[in-house]
Amino acid sequence: MISVQNAAFQYRDDLIFRNVSFELAKGQTAAILGPNGRGKTTLLKSIVGLLPLAQGSVETFGHIGYVAQKNHMAFSYKVLDIVVMGRAAHVGLFRTPGLNDYKIARATLDRLGIDSFADRLYTQLSGGERQMVMIARALASECEVLFLDEPTSALDFFNQALILKLLRRIVAEDGLTVLFATHVPQHAQYLADAVMLMHSVDHQDWGPAEEMLTETNLEALYGVPVKSLEVEHEGKVASNLVPLFV
Protein backbone atom coordinates (compact mmCIF):
# COMPACT_ATOMS: atom_id res chain seq x y z
CA MET A 1 0.00 0.00 0.00
CA ILE A 2 1.01 3.62 -0.59
CA SER A 3 -0.25 6.50 1.55
CA VAL A 4 0.52 10.14 0.70
CA GLN A 5 -0.78 12.92 2.95
CA ASN A 6 -0.61 16.68 2.25
CA ALA A 7 2.59 16.36 0.24
CA ALA A 8 4.31 19.46 -1.13
CA PHE A 9 7.56 19.99 -3.01
CA GLN A 10 9.48 23.20 -3.54
CA TYR A 11 12.55 23.80 -5.69
CA ARG A 12 14.29 26.99 -4.58
CA ASP A 13 11.51 29.61 -4.74
CA ASP A 14 9.24 27.58 -7.01
CA LEU A 15 6.43 25.48 -5.58
CA ILE A 16 5.99 22.41 -7.81
CA PHE A 17 2.94 20.88 -6.09
CA ARG A 18 1.18 20.97 -2.74
CA ASN A 19 -1.72 19.39 -0.84
CA VAL A 20 -1.31 16.06 -2.63
CA SER A 21 -3.08 13.25 -0.78
CA PHE A 22 -4.11 9.76 -1.85
CA GLU A 23 -4.01 6.12 -0.82
CA LEU A 24 -3.37 3.18 -3.10
CA ALA A 25 -4.39 -0.26 -1.85
CA LYS A 26 -2.25 -3.37 -2.15
CA GLY A 27 -2.44 -4.94 -5.59
CA GLN A 28 -3.78 -1.82 -7.31
CA THR A 29 -2.20 0.15 -10.15
CA ALA A 30 -2.38 3.94 -10.34
CA ALA A 31 -1.21 6.52 -12.86
CA ILE A 32 0.01 10.06 -12.27
CA LEU A 33 -1.22 11.73 -15.45
CA GLY A 34 -0.66 15.18 -16.92
CA PRO A 35 1.11 17.26 -19.56
CA ASN A 36 4.85 17.79 -19.53
CA GLY A 37 6.08 20.07 -16.77
CA ARG A 38 3.28 19.45 -14.27
CA GLY A 39 5.47 17.72 -11.68
CA LYS A 40 4.67 14.08 -12.37
CA THR A 41 8.27 12.89 -12.15
CA THR A 42 8.96 15.10 -9.14
CA LEU A 43 5.94 13.68 -7.31
CA LEU A 44 6.94 10.11 -8.15
CA LYS A 45 10.54 10.65 -7.01
CA SER A 46 9.30 12.27 -3.80
CA ILE A 47 7.15 9.24 -3.03
CA VAL A 48 10.05 6.88 -3.77
CA GLY A 49 12.27 8.92 -1.46
CA LEU A 50 14.69 10.28 -4.04
CA LEU A 51 13.60 13.89 -3.43
CA PRO A 52 12.73 15.51 -0.07
CA LEU A 53 9.22 16.83 0.48
CA ALA A 54 8.80 20.38 1.75
CA GLN A 55 5.91 19.13 3.86
CA GLY A 56 3.61 16.15 4.22
CA SER A 57 4.26 12.46 4.63
CA VAL A 58 4.63 9.30 2.56
CA GLU A 59 4.28 5.71 3.73
CA THR A 60 5.07 2.75 1.51
CA PHE A 61 4.38 -0.74 2.81
CA GLY A 62 6.58 -3.42 1.26
CA HIS A 63 9.89 -3.66 -0.59
CA ILE A 64 10.02 -1.23 -3.52
CA GLY A 65 11.38 -1.35 -7.06
CA TYR A 66 11.97 1.73 -9.23
CA VAL A 67 12.39 2.18 -12.98
CA ALA A 68 13.60 5.65 -13.97
CA GLN A 69 12.62 7.43 -17.16
CA LYS A 70 16.24 7.63 -18.32
CA ASN A 71 18.64 4.82 -17.56
CA HIS A 72 22.18 5.69 -18.53
CA MET A 73 25.04 3.34 -17.71
CA ALA A 74 28.52 4.77 -17.26
CA PHE A 75 30.06 1.39 -18.10
CA SER A 76 29.14 -1.23 -20.66
CA TYR A 77 27.78 -3.96 -18.39
CA LYS A 78 26.32 -7.22 -19.58
CA VAL A 79 22.55 -7.46 -19.21
CA LEU A 80 22.72 -10.30 -16.68
CA ASP A 81 25.00 -8.24 -14.43
CA ILE A 82 22.61 -5.28 -14.58
CA VAL A 83 19.65 -7.44 -13.59
CA VAL A 84 21.69 -8.93 -10.72
CA MET A 85 22.14 -5.36 -9.44
CA GLY A 86 18.46 -5.52 -8.57
CA ARG A 87 19.41 -8.03 -5.88
CA ALA A 88 21.42 -5.41 -3.95
CA ALA A 89 18.92 -5.14 -1.09
CA HIS A 90 19.18 -8.90 -0.53
CA VAL A 91 22.93 -9.17 -1.07
CA GLY A 92 23.93 -6.33 1.26
CA LEU A 93 26.90 -3.98 1.14
CA PHE A 94 29.70 -6.34 2.07
CA ARG A 95 29.28 -9.39 -0.12
CA THR A 96 29.03 -10.17 -3.80
CA PRO A 97 25.98 -11.72 -5.49
CA GLY A 98 25.83 -15.49 -5.13
CA LEU A 99 24.61 -18.31 -7.35
CA ASN A 100 21.05 -17.87 -6.12
CA ASP A 101 21.08 -14.18 -7.07
CA TYR A 102 22.20 -15.05 -10.60
CA LYS A 103 19.60 -17.81 -10.74
CA ILE A 104 16.85 -15.32 -9.86
CA ALA A 105 18.19 -12.81 -12.41
CA ARG A 106 18.21 -15.42 -15.19
CA ALA A 107 14.72 -16.60 -14.23
CA THR A 108 13.48 -13.01 -14.42
CA LEU A 109 14.95 -12.51 -17.88
CA ASP A 110 13.37 -15.78 -18.98
CA ARG A 111 10.01 -14.76 -17.57
CA LEU A 112 10.08 -11.53 -19.55
CA GLY A 113 11.09 -13.39 -22.70
CA ILE A 114 14.49 -11.75 -22.94
CA ASP A 115 16.76 -14.53 -21.68
CA SER A 116 18.69 -14.24 -24.96
CA PHE A 117 19.86 -10.79 -23.79
CA ALA A 118 21.83 -12.17 -20.82
CA ASP A 119 25.32 -11.91 -22.34
CA ARG A 120 24.68 -8.86 -24.51
CA LEU A 121 26.08 -5.46 -23.61
CA TYR A 122 23.49 -2.97 -22.37
CA THR A 123 24.90 -0.22 -24.58
CA GLN A 124 24.18 -2.31 -27.68
CA LEU A 125 20.46 -2.63 -26.94
CA SER A 126 17.64 -0.60 -28.45
CA GLY A 127 15.53 1.75 -26.32
CA GLY A 128 12.75 -0.79 -25.93
CA GLU A 129 15.19 -3.56 -25.04
CA ARG A 130 16.88 -1.37 -22.43
CA GLN A 131 13.54 -0.61 -20.82
CA MET A 132 12.75 -4.32 -20.61
CA VAL A 133 16.09 -4.89 -18.88
CA MET A 134 15.39 -2.16 -16.33
CA ILE A 135 11.99 -3.65 -15.57
CA ALA A 136 13.70 -7.02 -15.15
CA ARG A 137 16.18 -5.47 -12.72
CA ALA A 138 13.34 -4.05 -10.62
CA LEU A 139 11.46 -7.35 -10.62
CA ALA A 140 14.61 -9.29 -9.67
CA SER A 141 14.56 -7.34 -6.41
CA GLU A 142 11.36 -9.26 -5.57
CA CYS A 143 9.61 -5.95 -4.97
CA GLU A 144 6.07 -5.66 -3.68
CA VAL A 145 5.62 -2.05 -4.80
CA LEU A 146 6.80 -0.97 -8.25
CA PHE A 147 7.33 2.65 -9.32
CA LEU A 148 7.84 3.53 -12.99
CA ASP A 149 8.57 6.95 -14.48
CA GLU A 150 7.25 7.28 -18.04
CA PRO A 151 7.88 3.57 -18.80
CA THR A 152 7.16 3.97 -22.52
CA SER A 153 8.86 7.32 -23.08
CA ALA A 154 10.54 7.69 -26.50
CA LEU A 155 9.46 4.20 -27.63
CA ASP A 156 7.70 3.37 -30.88
CA PHE A 157 4.17 1.88 -30.97
CA PHE A 158 5.41 -1.71 -31.06
CA ASN A 159 7.63 -1.32 -28.00
CA GLN A 160 5.00 0.72 -26.16
CA ALA A 161 2.51 -2.12 -26.63
CA LEU A 162 5.15 -4.67 -25.62
CA ILE A 163 5.95 -2.88 -22.36
CA LEU A 164 2.30 -2.19 -21.48
CA LYS A 165 1.23 -5.79 -22.06
CA LEU A 166 4.20 -7.04 -20.06
CA LEU A 167 3.38 -4.78 -17.11
CA ARG A 168 -0.26 -5.78 -17.16
CA ARG A 169 0.66 -9.47 -17.09
CA ILE A 170 3.27 -9.15 -14.35
CA VAL A 171 0.97 -7.08 -12.14
CA ALA A 172 -1.79 -9.66 -12.48
CA GLU A 173 0.53 -12.60 -11.79
CA ASP A 174 2.42 -11.08 -8.85
CA GLY A 175 -0.25 -8.91 -7.25
CA LEU A 176 2.12 -5.93 -7.28
CA THR A 177 1.13 -2.45 -6.19
CA VAL A 178 2.16 -0.12 -9.02
CA LEU A 179 2.42 3.65 -9.36
CA PHE A 180 3.59 5.10 -12.67
CA ALA A 181 3.89 8.55 -14.21
CA THR A 182 2.75 9.13 -17.77
CA HIS A 183 1.59 11.89 -20.09
CA VAL A 184 -0.40 9.44 -22.25
CA PRO A 185 -4.08 8.99 -21.23
CA GLN A 186 -4.39 5.76 -23.24
CA HIS A 187 -1.67 4.12 -21.16
CA ALA A 188 -3.39 5.12 -17.93
CA GLN A 189 -6.63 3.75 -19.35
CA TYR A 190 -4.99 0.42 -20.21
CA LEU A 191 -3.17 -0.16 -16.91
CA ALA A 192 -4.60 1.89 -14.08
CA ASP A 193 -7.27 1.22 -11.47
CA ALA A 194 -6.92 4.79 -10.17
CA VAL A 195 -5.59 8.02 -11.67
CA MET A 196 -4.27 11.33 -10.38
CA LEU A 197 -4.76 14.24 -12.80
CA MET A 198 -2.02 16.86 -12.34
CA HIS A 199 -3.81 20.07 -13.37
CA SER A 200 -1.60 22.60 -11.59
CA VAL A 201 0.44 23.28 -8.45
CA ASP A 202 -2.72 23.50 -6.33
CA HIS A 203 -5.12 21.35 -8.33
CA GLN A 204 -4.93 17.57 -8.51
CA ASP A 205 -7.85 15.18 -8.92
CA TRP A 206 -7.68 11.59 -7.66
CA GLY A 207 -10.17 8.79 -8.17
CA PRO A 208 -11.11 5.61 -10.02
CA ALA A 209 -9.78 5.52 -13.58
CA GLU A 210 -13.24 5.39 -15.15
CA GLU A 211 -14.22 8.58 -13.31
CA MET A 212 -11.00 10.47 -14.03
CA LEU A 213 -10.50 9.53 -17.68
CA THR A 214 -13.52 11.28 -19.13
CA GLU A 215 -13.64 13.46 -22.23
CA THR A 216 -14.40 16.54 -20.11
CA ASN A 217 -11.59 15.94 -17.60
CA LEU A 218 -8.97 15.24 -20.25
CA GLU A 219 -9.90 18.27 -22.34
CA ALA A 220 -9.53 20.42 -19.21
CA LEU A 221 -6.18 18.77 -18.45
CA TYR A 222 -4.61 19.00 -21.92
CA GLY A 223 -6.53 21.80 -23.62
CA VAL A 224 -7.33 19.50 -26.55
CA PRO A 225 -10.72 17.92 -27.40
CA VAL A 226 -10.79 14.20 -26.58
CA LYS A 227 -13.27 11.53 -27.65
CA SER A 228 -13.79 8.06 -26.22
CA LEU A 229 -14.34 5.62 -29.08
CA GLU A 230 -15.47 2.00 -28.92
CA VAL A 231 -13.18 -0.18 -31.05
CA GLU A 232 -13.63 -3.88 -31.85
CA HIS A 233 -10.55 -6.03 -32.43
CA GLU A 234 -10.33 -9.82 -32.56
CA GLY A 235 -13.78 -10.19 -31.09
CA LYS A 236 -13.13 -7.84 -28.18
CA VAL A 237 -14.52 -4.34 -27.70
CA ALA A 238 -12.37 -1.71 -26.01
CA SER A 239 -12.82 1.96 -25.25
CA ASN A 240 -10.00 4.14 -26.57
CA LEU A 241 -9.29 7.79 -25.85
CA VAL A 242 -8.47 9.77 -28.98
CA PRO A 243 -7.30 13.43 -29.12
CA LEU A 244 -8.96 15.47 -31.87
CA PHE A 245 -6.56 17.66 -33.83
CA VAL A 246 -9.03 19.96 -35.56
Predicted regions and their residues:
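H-loop/switch region of ABC-family ATPase nucleotide-binding domains
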Residues: T182-H183
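ABC ATPase nucleotide-binding domains
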Residues: Y222-V246
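Helix-to-loop junction immediately C-terminal to a conserved catalytic motif
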Residues: V48
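The feature captures the beta-strand-to-loop junction immediately N-terminal to the Walker
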Residues: L33-P35
